[in-house]
Amino acid sequence: MRVLVVDESAERAEVLRDGLRRAGYEVSASLSSPLALLKTIDELQPDVIVIDTDSPSRDVLEHLVVMSERGPRPVVMFASDGAPEVIREAVRAGVSAYVVDGLDAARVKAIIDVAVARFEDFQRLRSELAEANLKLAERKLVERAKGILMKTRGLGEESAYALLRKSAMDRKLRIAEVARQLVDAANLLGA
């Protein structure tokens, strides 16, 4: 597993890199400033990002938000600042594990394992939510299309659905796509 290390302190970064290597991780790069974070992530495509900081700066959190939108990955943050609002901001920015009060090289592997597991669970939940929202939107679209057919053709609900389904099968499209086309056409015609 490739790890990108971000730490403004060269001494702490060396301790962290050493702990990661001993735990079996490949340290792909080490940054002393978060300014090149996005560029480095794009170039190296690390599996995990480990950030060691006294308190996460606004710049670091903004970079993490952008990274999460582009290509989310687990982020572990070791910080001295344990203020609840700082932790909440870090988690909202995409931090998978926020560890307060110092870096212990012996615990790094366990912390990264937990962060990766939490990240994977969160990604699975996010995917399931997106799928559920899509199905709900498609169901609403089919209901609108049925309503249009019922109104314009004088059909019952079952007949309207059967007509949508037949049209979808004849055109080798999903029923939601046929419904979308019908709703779009009705909107265009003002029906």
Where are these regions (language model features)?
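Conserved phosphotransfer microenvironments
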Residues: 13, 33-38, 47-67, 83
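C-terminal output helix
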Residues: 85, 103-112
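Conserved acidic segment of CheY-like receiver
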Residues: 1-12, 16-20, 49
